């Protein structure tokens, strides 16, 4: 009704941006006529215009003015370097991103190319643009591939990957445009705020950020805080004992499992049984606490399942990301939970960790003055994106209309029947020759369907978090659209390679060149990391994915399965390929490049960009020849697959979020291709079991049907949608709560990090310490002297003793020196005395080495900030866990948390001040003996 009256708000937004697109198109003809050098010179002209800006607002105005011409320049560079021209809808996407909004673009509409437009425009300011993807592979691919446009136009392009040392990170963050992942960005921010000298800081002030798969990072990952932790010793035998006890406790009798809240509650019988087994009287005994260990052991037993939430690899428990299905090497669950799972699996129990620094993605990305993002599916979460991040969602139209068919869901009574039906559908469509993609929600489920297909003799590829499959991810996806291909994938969200019907000839040709080239020119991995990296990793907290986890070097191989290629290359082409590789070795040297450098060369060779490197030109020639040979078959196969109906996507369980279901569906029917999707469900699926409630169970009894008979009913589909909406609302509330509580921490974090940065930059630390000292003296006076009482009742003697404890250089002061001063006069007197004492202290310290006092000031302030902030984080965590109980006393827990958290923060700031003053006055440096 409202739409009819006011028109669709999305259409209104697009209408507002349309004039920009028209202007870009007007520029196109003139810009086509420019030579390469003239095109590159446009960057210089744009920068000169931006140099005139005197404020951020003026900069934005100039960016809007030059936008049409700048976009036309990028479009032309794209044609020349990559052979790709931005469609009008891609220009629209670029404008939406530049305006700090979220562009919703369907799969296959070229999101990666869209990002080049706003990143070039905003990169012109020189303040840095961060393009964020969900994993290292995609960041590297985009930096190598799309980065060619920016490099051609004269902008610098950086790439930050796990495993890089601080110098490399700093250099890459200093570039105009930096490609990286959300976790690298977040951990670098936290590490920068733990560094002890400006030279260690790797990031610049934040400016503009474009997030690819924005919903995955800002919504799915929002509940996960980024944590850098140090190790604490805890007795491992307690974890093992707790695990044995949990194994003897029974659900419903000794404890209840709340799957919705992912929590366990022990019953009175449970407490009695555990105490009896432990031969103790109180699980909460302060001197020998057991409750925490037992709770974690039960959680590990009931809520964390092997091959679903984690896998065991090389004797280690490795987390599986529930949203992407990828393994998260180096990440650990906190609060002793990871140790409880290690005890359950009987692998080596690693040390427990203590939080040193933490931030949630929600608050991290809000640090950017301008934020934008791209995704295929954001409309379902529009309210949250607008409320939390102040980001509007604008849907861009597709370049070609979609011709995908979404068939209705079929529901079976139990899982076994569902899996059989999935296998049967695969068999039928496979016989027709249609490519099929089966999406599963866990490693375990993907292996169930894999076994069923094996027993039917259907050849298929498996893509899940198991390491042997991860390595081949891009190869598997590149051929998932070939005739008769069957691919099983765990949580397909965010898999960066498109499924092209008939197979991806460009990618296959690149794989073939890589097979021959890489073993000859890439340096073996042992030489890859210099001592600098290792030293840094051990000196600072180890971020995820650093180094090899079990010390054994895996020999890298570039061989791929011969089945991947549509045909074997001709002898003539193979000879040409061998010659090109030999030429590369002659020019670069045998095994002389890092893998990143080699991938970079190959990326340029696989495109059309201008280059003077004779090796790249030779490789490009052979790459194009291989591609042409493959294309003969892939284009014929493309036609065949289109006639058969395109890719068929099978979903095997509704995800907690409709958005992830839509992402899976979006794999079929890209760029106007035909395709179809269907979901196979069972009443035993998690979503229905946990959130469907009694309604679904009632429906199940109504349908007195055979096990293998599918149920199709509008009522049931309605219940499913309802369950999903319930889950989405439930998780939205959790994220909102995380956000509200973390907002309290965020304000404190900003204050403490700003203070830390001021100290790091060393802006007049002496004056800062003197202010600390004066405030400390004021607090001592206020503690012992009450101005409302007569002077004879003032405790002047103890006040003096306390002042001397802090500043021993005041030891000559006596009660008589204070005479009959007023409170204000006493404070002024102490201010003067403490300044004199500090000058005296400085003279003593600087005798040992000139300038030592300045170093000591920085060292002690940073040391106190870090130590007390670390303790404060633990206290705030404890407060947060206990504050929920206030709700029972008719008090709002959030308001109580804000109030108490603020008081604790003020106390911490006072402690920092006092400890710094005390430490500096107690500091007694030793004179270094002179070398003879």
Curated annotation (Swiss-Prot):
E.C. code: 7.4.2.8
InterPro entries: Helicase_ATP-bd (IPR014001), P-loop_NTPase (IPR027417), SecA (IPR000185), SecA_CS (IPR020937), SecA_DEAD (IPR011115), SecA_motor_DEAD (IPR014018), SecA_preprotein_X-link_dom (IPR011130), SecA_SF2_C (IPR044722)
GO BP of this protein: intracellular protein transmembrane transport; protein import; protein targeting; protein transport by the Sec complex
Tagged with keyword Transport: yes
EC category: translocase
Residues that coordinate or bind ATP: 90, 108-112, 498
Pfam families per UniProt: P-loop_SecA, SecA_DEAD, SecA_PP_bind, SecA_SW
Topology versus the membrane: Peripheral membrane protein
Family in the record: Belongs to the SecA family.
Protein name stated in the entry: Protein translocase subunit SecA
